[in-house]
Curated annotation (Swiss-Prot):
It is an enzyme of class 3 (hydrolase). This is Ribonuclease 3. The gene is rnc. Pfam families: dsrm (PF00035), Ribonucleas_3_3 (PF14622). GO terms for cellular component: cytoplasm.
Length: 227
């Protein structure tokens, strides 16, 4: 496990209360470990972090996307706070290297488990909020999510809806998605999905079926635009 100082540098934030940081990175498996003296793990912080993240992302979208209606804002927010995006932020922070877990959890692939990375990322947001204030937390979230927020094309946020709308506008049947391949262990599988609309088809991959479907839809949309 790497030192917390490296993580704080990536965050551009130094915790005043290091116990909050430790709690945010403590996997629930530790509660069953006889040598673990504390009964705290990241589950409660994750609950708070989810709410803080939703609030901050909602405010950012409301401020930056003045021409988008409520429906489109909701779709973009859904993309920004979904498991895949949160895990990409966690990957940027190399968060899997900092999660404190039992040896058994680690051997079972816990460091690459997307649920663990998502939960720890949300818990980390809550820890920053409790250690500082909403303004500081807002700035950190805006920085970490910047590359995703910059995408202003709804196609990139919600490619499945965009592809469905294209199919309907072109008088085609709705897109059909089919899982064609699954590779890897159960905790770190890679899925390949084929999407088909009329005579057009494209594949996409991801660590979840929904992610693979989105990537397939996005690839097909890009192909249709370039044809």
């Amino acid at each position: 496990m790497e030192s917390f100082e490296k993580l704080e540098k990536l965050l551009s934030y130094s915790f005043k209360n290091k116990e909050l940081l430790i709690e945010a990175l403590s996997h629930p498996s530790l509660r069953q470990h006889h040598e673990y003296k504390d009964d705290k793990d990241y589950e409660r912080l994750e609950f708070l972090g989810d709410a803080v993240l939703n609030l901050v992302i909602t405010e950012i979208l409301f401020r930056n996307f003045a021409n988008y209606n409520e429906g489109n804002l909701a779709k973009i927010r859904s993309y920004l706070v979904c498991k895949e995006t949160i895990c990409m932020v966690g990957a940027k922070l190399t968060l899997k290297n900092y999660i404190i877990m039992t040896h058994g959890e680690e051997v079972a692939g816990g460091r690459d488990n997307l649920n663990n990375i998502e939960n720890a990322t949300e818990a980390l947001i809550a820890a920053i909020y409790l250690d500082s204030n909403i303004e500081t937390t807002h700035d950190i979230i805006e920085k970490l999510w910047a590359e995703f927020i910059k995408v202003q094309n709804l196609t990139d946020y919600d490619p499945k809806t965009a592809l469905q709308e294209w199919a309907q506008a072109s008088d085609h049947h709705l897109p059909i998605y089919r899982l064609i391949k699954r590779e890897g262990a159960s905790h770190s599988s890679t899925f390949t999905v084929l999407v088909k609309v009329k005579d057009y088809e494209q594949t996409g991959t991801g660590h979840a079926i929904k992610e693979a479907e989105k990537n397939a839809a996005r690839s097909l949309l890009h192909r249709l635009k370039n044809d």
